[in-house]
Every structure is written in structure tokens, then in C-alpha cells.
């Protein structure tokens, strides 16, 4: 007997795992935790599906998880184009021991067991799955893998996937699925009660490396003894394991600033951090997306780091729209929000190391700001950028030496 769609949706209404207490003020990221981690201290295993997109802009979820993952032990990446190669070497020219395989069967052979999770690692502009993608996810479910998806198309709204989850006794996690509208918060202005510096990592385009730069900066300052909290605003950083987060582009626009403000306030009250770093999305100048505006409104940053890809001529997935200049983006950000750009970070796509270093020197002279590339240059350049802008951070770093 087929179970009704209404009953299926009721069963799977909660696509995040709830805490034992029902405090409505708890951040969504604290509630979301893979089932295997909820009941088992061992980090669960996962494979990432990224066919024909690994190391490309639409493969940014897979790219991010290969570089950094707190929630999962990444066992392999599925992309037949690079099968047999090392994921770290393909992505960053540095081997990391994560193999790339051609299909699910090879991933299982490589892992010598069925992984706990199948992560859909592609982030298409449409936010939707193709028919082939759906068949592959259903196949993974039939092999007893739980599913993690960061798309706007929610699998838990599809009776086909709900029935499969019951049939195979697996879970589905729609990372972008927002809270009930009655639980959403509007902006209150209490963000100004947050006394520690708040740095937003913004950019001149989407899929530019803002999350990577924010993560590297958070890790480095934390390793120096500072208490630094990264506020995640996109699906990849939530999947990576950020504790405080909101998938901002899935929140109704009226509540975007308030939801981000609420998460920052909770991080500040719970953690008493020295510094809060906010992951940026898209670009304030981008004609297709508005998330950057909500990030500036909701976080009211005391400083902005701007990421730019000098060799990118047109906006990602928008070949008719030229990239903005660094100067115009800085002017727009500083006009739109009561903040200042404290430094520039580069995405070195299409550039040699020598070209990157040359442009760093040129931009430093042109803008009078600290300029670096978080992936190819010494990470100390990032910490210097922050310490130069915020004397209290410089003092705390000096105390920790």
C-alpha cells in the first residue's frame, strides 16, 4: 500500500535534526548535524558527486568539501573526467589523498564499504536537478546512503524521494530548506550591541573563493589563540560544518537581514568571540543576485575584505555581463554600507604565480591596501590585513605570542 504524500511530508517535515531542548532562539546550524554524528562520535564517511564539474565554478560545493570538512570524512569525489587522479592535485596542485573515481560503484570499491553519506556536490545556477542526477541519487539511496543536497529543489518535497527514503531506511537533508515563516526574524538593530569586529568577505562575482578565504582566515586566527567565529551564509559552508549559519538565499527577502543578524547575535552571546567573520555571497554589483545587500544590512560589518579574480572577464554563468572593476565595487560597498574595505584578496584562476605576485604589488600600490591570495601566498598576509585594520586584534595577537 502506498503511503500518502501528505503523510510522507509530515514524516519528513524536519529535514534538520533538532536539539533536545526546543529553544526557538538556537541557531539553525547548531541543530543541523548528520545522523551518524548525532549518535556516534566518529565522523561519518561521505562521497561527493560532481560529474563534469569538479574544479569548476559549478563544482564549488565539492571543491569546498575537498579543502575543508568538519562534518564528514570525504572518501572520494565522483567525476569521470578526472577518474584516477587525486582531488587535491586537480584542485590546488597539492595531493590530499582523496581519490577521484568514475562512478558510485568505484567509490564503494575505493572505500571498501558503503559510505554513510552521498553529497550532491554541484551548485548549478538553476538550483535544480537533471533527470540523470535524480536517477543517480536514487541509486545511492538504494545502496543505503543518506543524502545531502544543497539545492533549491528540495528532495523532501518530492514523493519519489520520500518513498525511497522509507523503502531504504535512509535520511535526506535539504540544507537550504528554510525554517517555518513563523519562526523567521526581522532586523532589530541589535547587531550594534556586538562589540567585537565583524568582517564580511565580499566579492566582485559569485563562485570566486570568498568562502575559502573566510575559512582560511578563521583557521589561521584561531590557531593564533583568538576566538574567531565564522558565520556561514551558503550551503557549502553549512555542509562543511559551520556551527552558526543561515542559507540566506533561501530565506524570504523580508527576513534575510533579520535572520543573519539573529545568527550573529547568538554567536556573539554564546561564544564571546574576539572576531566574527561573515561569509559573503555573490557581489553587491551583480544584477542577478541580492544576497550581498542583505549581508551588508544584516551584519553591519565594521570591515570588508574584497575578493576579485583579475583574469575573469565576465561574470560566472553570465557571459554578457563584464566583471566590475575593483574600484567601482569598493565605491559601491562603501556607499551602500557604513563600512570600509580593509584589504583585497585575489582568485588566481588563469594566472601564474608570478602574475599573481605582480598584481599583488600593483594593487597594493594602486589602492593602498593589503593585498594577498589566500591559497598561494603566506597566510600571515591575511592576519596582517586584519591586525592593521583593528588595533584590538593586533593587541590580542601580540598577547598570544
Where are these regions (language model features)?
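Walker A (P-loop) phosphate-binding motif
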Residues: 186-224, 228
Amino acid at each position: 500500500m502506498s503511503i500518502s504524500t501528505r503523510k510522507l511530508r509530515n514524516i519528513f517535515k524536519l529535514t534538520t535534526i533538532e536539539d533536545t531542548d526546543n529553544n526557538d532562539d538556537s541557531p539553525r546550524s547548531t541543530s543541523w548535524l548528520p545522523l551518524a554524528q548525532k549518535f556516534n562520535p566518529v565522523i561519518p564517511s561521505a562521497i561527493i558527486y560532481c560529474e563534469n564539474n569538479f574544479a569548476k565554478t559549478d563544482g564549488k560545493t565539492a571543491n569546498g568539501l575537498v579543502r575543508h570538512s568538519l562534518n564528514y570524512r570525504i572518501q572520494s569525489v565522483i567525476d569521470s573526467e578526472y577518474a584516477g587522479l587525486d582531488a587535491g592535485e586537480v584542485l590546488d596542485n597539492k595531493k590530499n589523498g582523496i581519490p577521484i573515481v568514475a562512478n558510485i560503484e568505484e567509490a564503494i570499491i575505493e572505500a571498501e564499504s558503503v559510505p554513510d553519506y552521498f553529497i550532491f556536490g554541484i551548485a548549478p545556477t538553476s538550483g535544480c536537478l537533471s533527470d540523470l542526477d535524480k536517477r543517480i541519487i536514487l541509486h545511492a539511496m538504494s545502496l543505503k546512503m543518506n543524502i545531502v543536497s544543497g539545492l533549491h529543489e528540495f528532495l523532501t518535497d518530492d514523493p519519489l524521494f520520500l518513498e525511497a527514503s522509507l523503502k531504504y531506511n535512509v535520511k535526506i537533508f535539504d540544507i537550504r530548506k528554510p525554517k517555518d515563516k513563523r519562526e523567521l526574524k526581522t532586523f532589530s538593530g541589535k547587531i550594534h550591541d556586538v562589540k567585537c569586529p565583524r568582517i564580511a568577505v565580499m566579492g566582485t562575482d559569485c563562485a570566486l573563493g570568498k568562502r575559502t578565504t573566510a575559512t582560511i582566515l578563521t583557521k589561521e586566527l584561531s590557531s593564533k589563540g583568538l576566538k574567531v567565529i565564522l558565520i556561514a551564509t551558503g550551503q557549502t559552508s553549512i555542509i562543511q560544518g559551520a556551527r552558526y549559519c543561515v542559507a540566506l538565499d533561501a530565506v524570504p527577502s523580508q527576513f534575510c537581514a533579520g535572520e543573519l543578524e539573529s545568527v550573529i547575535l547568538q554567536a556573539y552571546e554564546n561564544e564571546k568571540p574576539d572576531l566574527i567573520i561573515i561569509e559573503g555571497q555573490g557581489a553587491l554589483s551583480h544584477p542577478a543576485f541580492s544576497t550581498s545587500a542583505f549581508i551588508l544590512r544584516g551584519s553591519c560589518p565594521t570591515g570588508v575584505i574584497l575578493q576579485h579574480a583579475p583574469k575573469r572577464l565576465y561574470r560566472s554563468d553570465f557571459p554578457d555581463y563584464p566583471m566590475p572593476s575593483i574600484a567601482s565595487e569598493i565605491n559601491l560597498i562603501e556607499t551602500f554600507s557604513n563600512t570600509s574595505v580593509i584589504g583585497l584578496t585575489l582568485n588566481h584562476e588563469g594566472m601564474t604565480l608570478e602574475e599573481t605576485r605582480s598584481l599583488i604589488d600593483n594593487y597594493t600600490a594602486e589602492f593602498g591596501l593589503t593585498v594577498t591570495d589566500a591559497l598561494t601566498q603566506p597566510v600571515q598576509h591575511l592576519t596582517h590585513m586584519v591586525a592593521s585594520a583593528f588595533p584590538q586584534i593586533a593587541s590580542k595577537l601580540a598577547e598570544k605570542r
